A protein has these predicted regions:
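Conserved P-loop NTPase/AAA+ ATPase motor core
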Residues: 1-105
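Conserved small/polar residues in nucleotide/adenosyl-binding loops
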Residues: 108-114
Length: 114
């Protein structure tokens, strides 16, 4: 099943909408395309762990994820949540009918005082 979700690529004070397309089919591979950096490519392991801890099962399907536009570099772990939600929706574990109406943004800051 093909589903779309939306995130944002933040560059300075501006942001570009990133369309995340997830397709689950039979197979066991995981592909992530659309100019992701190392942290985004490593999201696979973080997402599997987070879904298991949350009581979901990571689909044992071939998962292809396209992050568009392809010419904008996607950096950091802020895409983990929209990727995880897209994977669950494509695997029909979540209702995808309203997914296209929202942008899923995750921002983490660490400003712990020393």
């Amino acid at each position: 099943m093909l589903v779309k979700s939306y995130a944002a690529a933040v560059q300075g004070i501006s942001a570009t909408v990133v369309t995340i397309e997830v397709n689950c089919t039979k197979g066991i591979q995981f592909f992530l395309v659309g100019l992701p950096d190392v942290a985004v490519r490593e999201s696979h392991e973080r997402i599997i762990s987070a879904l298991q801890v949350s009581g979901y099962k990571f689909p044992r399907n071939r998962i292809v994820i396209n992050m568009a536009p392809a010419d904008i570099r996607k950096e950091g772990s802020s895409y983990d949540l929209p990727l995880a939600i897209g994977i669950l929706a494509a695997a029909e574990e979540l209702d995808a009918s309203r997914l296209g109406h929202y942008m899923i943004c995750l921002l983490y800051t660490s400003d712990a005082a020393d």
